[in-house]
Design a protein with these regions (language model features):
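Terminal or standalone catalytic/regulatory effector modules within metabolic enzymes
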Residues: 1-166
Length: 166
């Protein structure tokens, strides 16, 4: 199995971030990073702009408003958005939709641990639908931070919408 240089560089960047977050990196962690990256790689011929999560922050609690700050890049343009929602993910997804000017609706959502331990890597999978066409798109993301994994998954689904010409 060969990994293209650009993909290997992305895997290494994600590995360094993971090493900063965890005390011990396991072979399962490395497998999750590698397999997930190859699963979400974009076709070389695609010309659709790719959105990428740069950073995020949430405020959430039982007696306070749920607020999400999201910073994205698209076509080398940096965008920032802040939104309120019923929960931190609702707020985050609203911020992404507003920044990108899309009407995507969350249809299905799941999170699972793909490695062991309290600091395990979580994988989020979302199914979103386009309000314009009704088409469904699936996205996935991984991180030790499940909010980050969820945002990666949502953005992955939106990137697929863009690739389909929406």
């Amino acid at each position: 199995y060969e990994i293209p240089d650009e993909e290997l560089e992305d895997i290494f960047t994600r590995f360094k971030k993971l090493a900063d977050e965890k005390k011990t990196i396991t072979s399962s962690d490395l497998e999750a990073l590698t397999l997930h990256r190859s699963k979400i790689s974009r076709p070389e011929e695609s010309t659709a702009p790719t959105c990428k999560l740069i950073s995020h922050s949430i405020t959430s609690g039982s007696d306070i408003p749920k607020i999400s700050y999201v910073k994205l890049s698209r076509d080398n343009n940096i965008m920032e958005g802040v939104e309120y929602g019923a929960g931190p993910l609702d707020a985050a997804f609203k911020a992404v939709n507003k920044m990108l000017g899309v009407e995507a609706r969350l249809e299905d959502f799941s999170v699972r641990a793909v490695t062991e331990g309290e600091d395990s890597i979580g994988e989020a999978v979302v199914k979103i639908s386009s309000a314009a066409s009704g088409e469904m798109y699936t996205g996935s993301g991984i991180s030790t931070d499940i909010v980050e994994a969820s945002l990666q998954a949502y953005i992955s689904g939106i990137n697929k919408m863009f690739e389909a010409g929406e």
